[in-house]
């Protein structure tokens, strides 16, 4: 009977250990997810800025294809 109680105590101890590792993993994944969300939000802001900048660019500043010199391999 003592062996059974010791086995049960060992199983409980193993489960507690597994649960602790799972909690640590969940916390680490949550931190990584939070950092990625901040990065995505920052990139979205930068993307909106760049799109706005491109929309305001004056297309008349760009040279016409006929005005540009051909590349050196021609």
Swiss-Prot record:
Q: Which domain of life is it from?
A: Bacteria
The record's listing under Pfam families reads:
SlyX
Query: What InterPro entries does the annotation carry?
Result: SlyX
Which Gene3D superfamilies does the entry link to? 1.20.5.300
Q: Which family does it belong to?
A: Belongs to the SlyX family.
Enumerate the HAMAP family for this protein.
Answer: SlyX
Quote the protein name from its UniProt record.
Protein SlyX homolog
Which organism encodes this protein?
Answer: Aliivibrio fischeri (strain ATCC 700601 / ES114)
**Gene this chain is encoded by:** slyX
């Amino acid at each position: 009977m003592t062996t059974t109680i010791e086995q049960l105590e060992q199983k409980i101890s193993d489960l507690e250990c597994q649960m602790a590792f799972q909690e640590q993993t969940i916390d680490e994944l949550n931190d990584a997810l939070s950092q990625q969300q901040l990065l995505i939000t920052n990139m979205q802001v930068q993307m909106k800025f760049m799109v706005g900048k491109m929309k305001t660019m004056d297309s008349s500043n760009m040279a016409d294809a006929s005005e540009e010199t051909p590349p050196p391999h021609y």
